[in-house]
Amino acid sequence: MTAHFPFDNSYVALPPNFFARVAPTPVAAPRLIKLNRPLAVQLGLDPDLLETPEGAEILSGNQMPETAASIAMAYAGHQFGNFVPQLGDGRAILLGEVVDRNGVRRDIQLKGAGRTPFSRMGDGRAALGPVLREYIVSEAMAALGIPTTRSLAAVLTGETVLRDPIQPGAVLTRVASSHIRVGTFQYFAARGDLASVRALADHAIARHYPEAAQAPSPYLALLEGVIGRQAELVASWMMVGFIHGVMNTDNCSVAGETIDYGPCAFMDTFDPKTVYSSIDQFGRYAYGNQPPIALWNLTRLAECLVRLLADDDDKGIEIAQTALGGFAERFNAAYLAKLAAKLGLFTSQPDDQQLSQEFLTALAKGEADFTLAFRRLSDAAVDPSDLGEVRALFADPAAFDEWAPRWRARIAAEPQDATTRQAAMRRVNPAYTPRNHRIEAVIRAAVDRDDFAPFEEILTVLANPFEEKAEFARYAEPPQPHEEVLETFCGT
């Protein structure tokens, strides 16, 4: 029985300059590592069939579903601030789109499926380590409630890829609301192809912002919609200590999802200047720089849309600048509301912003673990007089000691009882995030020993990040000095 993919493909209806038609390159011996069964069901797929040898053939690219229309998408992008007019999918091939059980159109893409016309000098393949990292982190982000691409499957290819060091090859099946990027708009704008910019904008409106079609200025509504989603998204990243690592415009999703998990990482000790990515030598994409970089990326999108916003360029620029001016308000509102909730503040008072920021200052001065400090504060919410377990996380607790009485006084003014407040705080302060040293241990077990038991266990832990279980206590702990991962790699 054939594994059926109910593809309904819309992107291939766009002009041929939007993509290159290309088939995946077959692999030697596909072996399914992991299938995301709940996601498969949500997509209208049969997980039992996908777990058969034939399923592995499809998920590796060796066989193509009948209704697939495989393409590599064209896009450009600013990489660390430098514009590259042609990038495109160099190792990812979009099989097609399905409409899931919620009526949402989703892309199904094979990452590591072989060379495409956009591969440049690359081999089009993916190594096992980065595939496992993306699977773990994208699924963890989904469980944390943060918009993200998803991972449907991971497959070993039976081949090796030439990386440093040589690694087993793998293919990730990625699911996204779409793979339209800011860089997709830049690809056509850089060529002066206004007709294609308009066609792409119309497609993005129909797919992601249908309400914009009814607005007095649909393209302005599109821009404002993307600005709003990116503001909310980055605010959510900041709440869990997530550092994307490569916030290039080609990694900025118009749908408002986290996309392209390369050298991403979750911060341990709180420091706004934290950088893990080996290729971010000057800290452009450091944790604390992510909000202004998001605005920078959105400004590049606005530049592409100027000619659609008004016939006169000066007027179009003025309209775009006004829209971009709304980013700070949207981001700050989301950021401060989320941060207040993490501190157990569910009503608003004038000094709340200062109280929230002073806790972050105390974390930085005390070199405290970001995730664990908020979680232990949640645990202490029932009896705020005893903050010993929180205080113990600070190498220098002086700033925390100064802050704690003000927090106690502030939460005493909240209408909720202590138990309700604690439950609410635990719903926004995870016990578990994908800590870098844990991911590294999973990758080492898989790559060095073909042992995927740690991979399965970390997925189980991270599927319920807000629910503490005694047997998973080690996953909540920061790394010991010898376990610290100071640098992460793109893996491409």
From Swiss-Prot:
InterPro entries on file: SelO (IPR003846)
Keyword rRNA-binding among record annotations: no
One Pfam family, short name: SelO
Enzyme Commission number(s) from the entry: 2.7.7.-, 2.7.7.108
Active site (catalytic residues): D250 (proton acceptor)
Assigned keywords, A-Z: ATP-binding, Magnesium, Manganese, Metal-binding, Nucleotide-binding, Nucleotidyltransferase, Transferase
Reactions mediated catalytically: L-seryl-[protein] + ATP = 3-O-(5'-adenylyl)-L-seryl-[protein] + diphosphate; L-threonyl-[protein] + ATP = 3-O-(5'-adenylyl)-L-threonyl-[protein] + diphosphate; L-tyrosyl-[protein] + ATP = O-(5'-adenylyl)-L-tyrosyl-[protein] + diphosphate; L-histidyl-[protein] + UTP = N(tele)-(5'-uridylyl)-L-histidyl-[protein] + diphosphate
One MF annotation (Gene Ontology) recorded for this entry: AMPylase activity
Chain positions recorded as ATP binding sites: G88, G90, R91, K111, D123, G124, R174, R181, D260
Binding site for Mg(2+): N251, D260
Cofactor: Mg(2+); Mn(2+)
Function field: Nucleotidyltransferase involved in the post-translational modification of proteins. It can catalyze the addition of adenosine monophosphate (AMP) or uridine monophosphate (UMP) to a protein, resulting in modifications known as AMPylation and UMPylation.
Entry similarity comment: Belongs to the SELO family.
NCBIfam families: PRK00029.1
Name of the protein in its database record: Protein nucleotidyltransferase YdiU
Organism: Rhodopseudomonas palustris (strain TIE-1)
